[in-house]
From Swiss-Prot:
Xref: PANTHER family: INTEGRATOR COMPLEX SUBUNIT 8
Organism: Mus musculus (Mouse)
Name recorded for this polypeptide: Integrator complex subunit 8
Subunit architecture: Component of the Integrator complex, composed of core subunits INTS1, INTS2, INTS3, INTS4, INTS5, INTS6, INTS7, INTS8, INTS9/RC74, INTS10, INTS11/CPSF3L, INTS12, INTS13, INTS14 and INTS15. The core complex associates with protein phosphatase 2A subunits PPP2CA and PPP2R1A, to form the Integrator-PP2A (INTAC) complex.
Keyword NAD attached: no
Keywords for the protein's UniProt record, in alphabetical order: Chromosome, Nucleus, Phosphoprotein, Repeat, TPR repeat
Domain of life assignment: Eukaryota
Modified residues (Phosphothreonine): 18
Chief location of this protein within or outside the cell: nucleus
Keyword Mitochondrion (UniProt): no
Transmembrane parts of this sequence: none
Recorded family membership: Belongs to the Integrator subunit 8 family.
Matches recorded under InterPro entries: Int8 (IPR038751)
Amino acid sequence: MSAEAADREAATSSRPCTPPQTCWFEFLLEESLLEKHLRKACPDPAPVQLIVQFLEQASKPSVNEQNQVQPPPDNKRNRVLKLLALKVAAHLKWDLDILEKSLSVPVLNMLLNELLCISKVPPGTKHVDMDLSALPPTTAMAILLYNRWAIRTIVQSSFPVKQAKPGPPQLNVMNQMQQEKELTENILKVLKEQAADCILVLEAALRLNKDLYVHTMRTLDLLAVEPGTVNGETENSTAGLKIRTEEMQCQVCYDLGAAYFQQGSTDSAIYENAREKFFRTKELLAEIGSLSLHCTIDEKRLAGYCQACDVLVPSSDNNSQQLTPYSQVHICLRSGSYQEVVQIFIEDNLTFTLPVQFRQSVLRELFQKAQQGNEALDEICFKICVCNTVRDVLEGRTISVQFNQLFLRPNKEKIDFLLEVCSRSINVEKASDSLKGNMAAFLKNVCLGLEDLQYVFMISSHELFITLLKDEERKLLVDQMRKRSPRVNLCIKPVTSFYDIPASASVNIGQLEHQLILSVDPWRIRQILIELHGMTSERQFWTVSNKWEVPSVYSSVILGIKDNLTRDLVYILMAKGLHCSTVKDFPHSKQLFTACLELVTEFSPKLRQVMLNEMLLLDIRTHEAGVGQSGERPPSDLISRVRGYLEMRLPDIPLRQVVAEECVAFMLNWRENEYLTLQVPAFLFQNNPYVKLGQLLAATCKELPGPKESRRTAKDLWEVVVQICSVSNQHKRGNDGRVSLIKQRESTLGIMYRSELLSFIKKLREPLVLTIILSLFVKLHNVREDIVNDITAEHISIWPSSIPNLQSVDFEAVAITVKELVRYTLSINPNNHAWLIIQADIYFATNQHSAALHYYLQAGAVCSDFFNKAVPPDVYTDQVIKRMIKCCSLLNCHTQVAILCQFLREIDYKTAFKSLQEQNSHDAMDSYYDYIWDVTILEYLTYLHHKRGETDKRQIAIKAIGQTELNASNPEEVLQLAAQRRKKKFLQAMAKLYF
């Protein structure tokens, strides 16, 4: 032997080998093998697998000489296999928790029926008619096991179960799963019919006063040897595993409680029975202790049941001290004692008894009641939110958005309550350093977030704040407050009361500044500034608020005014006017701008023109937000002023781009296309990008009715937008000498940035203009080479079909722009079917099939009076129907696919038949058969259900096909009417599903 061979042999011999798995038939050949196998630490196969194998082999049907399937024969082999299955269950001590977890309902049903059979329970006799006290202990125990399993299975079937993710389709496996599913449903149907009897049997068991016995492996062997002496009080019936009365009653009480609790959802009075059984279970568990072998009760689940029963059926003899906080909260909510809920939550902040999720659910419930009109709950919602926030702070979680929203406008009462909750939620002497640190950080952050110094002093002077924060931390906080507001002089020592501070000049200045910030009356603003300038000449009062913002093109002119009072007044009037315009407070904005115009007319022609421009913009916005919404045309003088602004050529006048932008949008919205295309001066077209864009849009709208060859401006508009959406490529040499390509997202290749174009478009409301822009961007989106699903749009044929330099276009930005444009256009008119189809196509292209169906259906609904009329064929084209079919198919709604195949100009039978063959359908299936009008599809359905043995569904298909209006000999008008009626009902059903 060579050295290599010796090494291989040594390696092979040293490798541990896995012992072969014991086969089921080996247990038939050797009687003692089962006990040896079960005594192993990790037997393979496991005990529950053995039960499945034994019963599977014992229940296999046989085939006779005529090749006919016969039921499994009652021979010695099958009897031994069933006995082996029972012995394995006896080894597991008949623990239903283990058996239910590992065995399917049909297998466990077979096992327990075999137990009843071997325990000599007379077949066909109702268990409820049998006297358990007169039966042998093992027989009574077998009946109890079966009835316990029955109600446990009913309860378990009521819980939602997550469907297992199907693997690759395999016909045999799928058929087997389908058979097992149907068998389980049949067993559950029988068990539910027997549920009342099962409960009576278990209630009778609670009246038993004797110990019971359950079969062991030894007693089962004795039964096999002495079948004639089983039913008497012999050794066999009392030699099993002893189950004490208390253990049996404890387990039965728990199972009955679960059954009653499940039934309580339909009859709330039954919750009282559930409560009684669960609390009796707790008492028996306390008596039995941890020595029980038979009781396998999940004590956490039992505690949850008891808590739920306390809430649903509060005990009359329990006082509030005996109830859990959870129950107390529910009782208070039911009685409307919301202040008591607040106190419970504050006390719970010390004990952390209530789950955070429960506290949040209480707050959500109260918020909903407050939103429904119960204004008295607003204060309670705030208090509960504060309690929850303090709990979150103590446990180191982030502060909720709700607290920040409710604390936007603090007042003295809110601050007082917050400090009370904080003080009562922490025991400073016993609390850990982490709890103290969390609370201190929270109080500091609250201080930093407050603008009113009165409230800051309330917190900083509080005992808890002084206790938790060290001197250094308080000094640091003071420094931070000083940086935030240089005019604030905080003292480190706590102030007893804010109102005790004596008034001084600085306080008077602060009060006037506060009034200056709040006032929108131009004459009051002027008076305040005169007073302030009389008190001090060193200050620049236009800097009082950082919210006062004036565009830089204006501020350089305004700040050049030499007189301090005039400069402050002009700046503040303009800043406040611009702010009011932004928040759509147009009347106050008009007052402020008018006062500013009167002021600057006296000394600055430049600022006078600025104010005239701003007042023009204000008038445009006022009209568009007011009567313009209802379609009323603007007055002719406003249109003349807009033209005058566009044609203005005054040098050195500071201009805001937004004014020109709004003016062009205004002209497009009111269809002033003649002016934009023929009367705009040439210099404007060259110098103002918005005028150029507006002229191209207006000209394209005018040329739409003409032939394609005459649409020169459409090509010009296309080139302008392509340039805007193009990226500039720059080459950069790195440290390693390599040249890399950099794409500049916002390039200056076009007449404006893409973001500016988007901002301009969002000022348009004219449907035709928006349709043209949307059509252009959709075409640009479809031009890309890697596009899989095109998006459709109106007038898409007017645009060029290719781009010379395809790589230069930023298609990612184009896709984002298309989505934003569709979102905006639908906010203008949510009933435009063409825009809805575009939105649906976008969702389809991004594989959001449910959303795509929503918009396809909405597009059909808006142009057919919710499908009461026929959907126009130019809306539901074959392409749209095919995309709806694909969406339904990918959502596993295969019956919907088959019905939609009828909507095509030529019915797609291949797709319809293939979809109907799918068994894993997530739609209403046979409930949709009434919507099928094509007889060929109905005939195929009848054949398919007959082939599968689905009698009920076959009858539904036959009933649908038998309707007289579908008779092929009917006139064409009758058949069309029948099809239209079914289309209407189907589309309305789909709309209810996806809307």
